[in-house]
Amino acid sequence: MKWKTSRRSFVQSAAASVVPAVLMQMRPGVAKALGSLGADTPEAAGDAAWKNAGVVDTARSPFAKLRPVPVRAVEIQEGFWSKRRTTNVDSSIPSMHDELIDHGRMDNFLRLEGKSTQPQKGPVFSDSDIYKWMEAVGFVLQSGDRPSLRATTESMIRDVVAIQEPSGYLNTYYQDDRKALRMQYDVQTTGHELYCLGHMLQGAIAIYRANGDRTLLDAGIRFVDGYLLPNFGPRANQKGIVSGHPEIEMALMELYRTTGERKYVDLAGYILHGDSRIPLRQQQVVYMYCGIPFPQRTRLEGHAVRAMYACCGATDYYLETGDPAYWKTLNTLWEDLNQHQLYVTGGVGARETGEAFGDAYELPNARAYGESCAAIGMMMWNWRMLAASGEARFTDVIERALYNGINSGMSLDGRTYCYRNPLAFDPKGDSSDRHAPEGKIRNPWYDTTCCPPNLERTFASLPGYFYSTSDDGVYVHLYDNSAMSWRLKDGSAVRIQQTTKYPWEGTVKITVSPAEAREFVLHVRIPGWSAKNTVKVNGAVVSDVRAGAYLPIKRRWTAGDTVELSFDMTTRLLKANPAVNEDRGRVAFQRGPVVFCMEGLDQANKAGNLVGYTAKLDGESSVRYEADLLGGVVVLEHPGAVAQSAADTGLYYSANASEKVTENAATLRLIPYYAWSNRAPSTMQVWVPYRYS
């Protein structure tokens, strides 16, 4: 039976509750999967089950090939990511707390509690800033207790739940004369009520999984059970739901995984399917990326963050139901992402107007939007696709975004942030750029401050992305000095230790130490960017190593067995598809997973701009690690030239008038893209014009 149900017939066929309304529309296999949900719930696994949950807890998801390893089971040791994570905990999260307080985000709650006389401040989604910050703290606490941070968060949670209404409703914006607007159809499209609830649930779950504290979680459940489920859904006596800004879908799915309550899967499925009773214009359906059955989507369009979050929720739904229509659509959208919409830095979203995806191959550089939240959403989506498939193509995309378009979003000192992440920039350029006031692309605060706490929760949760387990063994996804202490499917303990200088060097030593000798498969990822690879097990070379895939190493492992990986760290000069107009005649530099860029202040002429520089396409880059530069980075130097025009050169001149322009040899100096704009203001570009010798 093919999925051809319209939104109207879906709603008309709704029965006495959300559950049968959804089940009636599904293939027998999907309905059976839904009917069995909750049979092996977290509650049934013991009182301490919250300790064992991953970032996305697919441990019991019937259509997941991989199971997560909890944040607490992985230690990121001294190396590349440890510096970022230390800065995140010691600088970013505390300073963002102060920004949230200074800009009235907590006063919005305190006002309703009678503890503040300040008026409501901030946009409609202000509550979500608090919840994302709390989620970041939850992941920090999963790596180890921080008493002061925990106490601060517990105090904030008490103030949040104190204003919850008897119905379960909890939102600081729709109060006083705005109460009548709650969940009205025209408000649902842009009002962010369910978006805020989604972040409340995600923050609550992260905190619950850190220390078992259910205070915020129970408040979130009361909101869903007491306010949403009785009043909103497909029944004739209920109002319809459109999420407006997808987020609630994946939050409900994670709430199911936390509680075992099937009704949350069904509610998420109803929202993903859309409700024809809500009148939507086509432009709204495109921009919001919701409101019609998700399987009807054929391309990525509209608001980039909304689209990525919708894909996260849809993948979560597939992981629990196995609906093939969802999986087919998700793969179609993923191909669109990788063939037409993905920046070389892992950023997504080309247009400032609507913070949106553009047309196929529309990937401008200076005008690139590349919102930090969109890159994070894209990583979150690919993590779920990886869980469903076990395929390295998704991990390659995660790595590209993580090292480049996400890592660029936070300054090296952790106190300023990029809302957008362009691939070319001039601080003296467009004065109308609202995200770069006075030419500053990094700022400590934005009134739409979704990106800073989103970056903070991502870096706090990073240990949970390094490893997974499967029916046959362990998967190693990301590389850095780290140690996983967890267990195989049969419950036996195993420790995986990585020793490496990745991403600056391409060698990784993995030491495998099961508590007792065990036969299982160690799946190690061979990055798609690495052309030549060597793998050794206890010194013996392994054959059939393929780039862009997981290498399965099956053996009886004993404590101290080693796997040595050697990746190709040759600097690669990348060309874009000719259909990408702005990149035609240009190259981008990538070494390992790291994309590089030029900053004007690094070039020999110190001119402050990058006009006229070209790279020799057949030149060879030299590589040098500079420990005292930008926290310690690899620097590339590449032969090229810089052109200078004669004083009388007009706007246009004859192609034969060679005397108008002179070229002098120059050495181009490039730094990692993630580290740009951490010194004095400077021009920057990723895509460099090239020439042949």
Ranges and model annotations:
Residues 519-537:
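Beta-strand-rich binding/interaction modules
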Residues 37, 41-53, 268, 330, ...:
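C-terminal beta-rich recognition modules with glycine/proline-rich loops and embedded aromatic residues
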Residues 176, 180, 184, 188-191, ...:
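Asp-box/WD-like beta-propeller blade repeats and closely related beta-sheet repeat scaffolds
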Residues 221-293, 299-307:
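Hydrophobic, small-residue-rich alpha-helical packing segments that form membrane-like cores
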Residues 536-540, 592:
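Short strand-turn-strand beta-turns centered on an Asx-Gly dipeptide
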Residues 9-33:
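N-terminal export signals
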Residues 1-5, 32:
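Secretory targeting signals
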Residues 42-147, 151, 181-210, 246-263, ...:
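Aromatic (Trp/Tyr) and acidic
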